[in-house]
């Protein structure tokens, strides 16, 4: 059995929801407290046991490469000033994993971004992690999916329940049977119109695939939104081999839109005791202001 050693992180999107902030800075580099969002994703992959990561980038994404590269001048400056704690944080970002980069030359959708990394993956099972979803869990969300892959030797799609009124925002599974938290799936539906979703189990940014998925991504079939959708390829893969969904444990934070990004930042800040002690009285004072 081949183990899951490699992961793809698509990071080529334009980040239009965060304009003008993302005009020159990648959305993936927007910080949650003191770390860019993409670092949380990579840390989860590493904790799950991933050895090699390929980040699929686009134009104006050089800052991602710089962040995970070595910075001798900065490290020397911090060392000379005795800022050891900051130095360790900087070194950690540079030593997380073997990280590689490939460019998606045209914004053709998530399925196309994954397809761009096919030569890096080869004939191996692999993971995909989306940068809009940060997961906090006792066992990393991706590790839970990798464990299920080792039991089934099948592709595993990470899902969680979402409110019914939000199902139109996600890929949704139509479950056939279930065993514990694992579902055999009849259909995968990309962003169903309101009121038509077959369930409220939404695909939430964590996947483990067999390499056969590339056969269907190779077809470059245009789907919803005029893009090459990963969900469409998953549906086709499910016709020739079992594809399971797994309701992974943990709290998922949606940092792909402004409100979710702000609330995640606040919640993560509150998890830091020093920041919490300062934030609580500030927020209480803010909420008590009559003009708000």
From Swiss-Prot:
Q: Where's it found, cell-wise?
A: Cell membrane; Membrane raft
- Which species is the source of this protein? Bacillus subtilis (strain 168)
Chief subcellular location equals membrane
Report the transmembrane regions from the record.
none
Specify the domain of life of the species encoding this protein: Bacteria
**Pathway(s) served:** Glycolipid metabolism; diglucosyl-diacylglycerol biosynthesis
User: What CDD domains does this protein's entry cite?
Assistant: UGPase_prokaryotic
The keyword Nucleotidyltransferase appears for this protein: yes
In terms of SUPFAM superfamilies, this protein maps to: Nucleotide-diphospho-sugar transferases (SSF53448)
Q: What is this protein called?
A: UTP--glucose-1-phosphate uridylyltransferase
Listed GO cellular component terms? membrane raft; plasma membrane
- Record's note on what induces expression: By heat shock, salt stress, oxidative stress, glucose limitation and oxygen limitation. Expressed under control of the sigma-B transcription factor.
UniProt GO BP: enterobacterial common antigen biosynthetic process; UDP-alpha-D-glucose metabolic process
Q: What is its EC number?
A: 2.7.7.9
Q: Which family does it belong to?
A: Belongs to the UDPGP type 2 family.
Q: What else is known?
A: GtaB is the main UGPase enzyme producing UDP-glucose under both aerobic and anaerobic fermentative growth conditions. YngB augments UDP-glucose production under anaerobic growth conditions.
Q: What is a single molecular function from GO for this protein? A: UTP:glucose-1-phosphate uridylyltransferase activity
NCBIfam families the UniProt entry points to: galU (TIGR01099)
Primary role? Catalyzes the formation of UDP-glucose from glucose-1-phosphate and UTP. This is an intermediate step in the biosynthesis of diglucosyl-diacylglycerol (Glc2-DAG), i.e. the predominant glycolipid found in B.subtilis membrane, which is also used as a membrane anchor for lipoteichoic acid (LTA). Has a role in the biosynthesis of all phosphate-containing envelope polymers, since UDP-glucose serves as a glucosyl donor not only for the biosynthesis of LTA but also for wall teichoic acids (WTAs). Is required for biofilm formation.
| Catalysed reaction equations from the record | alpha-D-glucose 1-phosphate + UTP + H(+) = UDP-alpha-D-glucose + diphosphate
């Amino acid at each position: 059995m081949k183990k899951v050693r490699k992961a793809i992180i698509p990071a080529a999107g334009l980040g239009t929801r965060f304009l003008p902030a993302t005009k020159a800075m990648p959305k993936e580099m927007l910080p949650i407290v003191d770390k860019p969002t993409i670092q949380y994703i990579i840390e989860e992959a590493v904790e799950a046991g991933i050895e090699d990561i390929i980040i699929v980038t686009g134009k104006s994404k050089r800052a991602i490469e710089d962040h995970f590269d070595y910075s001798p001048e900065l490290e020397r400056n911090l060392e000379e000033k005795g800022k050891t704690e900051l130095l360790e944080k900087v070194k950690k970002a540079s030593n997380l994993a073997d990280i590689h980069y490939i460019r998606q030359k045209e914004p053709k959708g998530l399925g196309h971004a994954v397809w761009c990394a096919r030569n890096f993956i080869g004939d191996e099972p692999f993971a995909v992690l989306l940068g809009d979803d940060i997961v906090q869990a006792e066992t990393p969300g991706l590790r839970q999916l990798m464990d299920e892959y080792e039991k089934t030797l099948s592709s595993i799609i990470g899902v969680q329940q979402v409110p019914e009124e939000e199902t139109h925002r996600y890929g949704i599974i139509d479950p056939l049977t279930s065993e514990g938290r694992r579902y055999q799936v009849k259909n995968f539906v990309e962003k169903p119109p309101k009121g038509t979703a077959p369930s409220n189990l939404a695909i939430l940014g964590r996947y483990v695939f067999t390499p056969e998925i590339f056969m269907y991504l190779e077809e470059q079939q245009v789907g919803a939104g005029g893009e090459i959708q990963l969900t469409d390829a998953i549906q086709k893969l499910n016709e020739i081999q079992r594809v399971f969904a797994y309701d992974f444990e943990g709290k998922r934070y949606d940092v792909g839109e402004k409100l979710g990004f702000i609330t995640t930042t606040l919640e993560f800040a509150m998890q830091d005791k020093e920041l919490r002690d300062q934030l609580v009285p500030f927020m209480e004072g803010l909420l008590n202001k009559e003009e708000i």
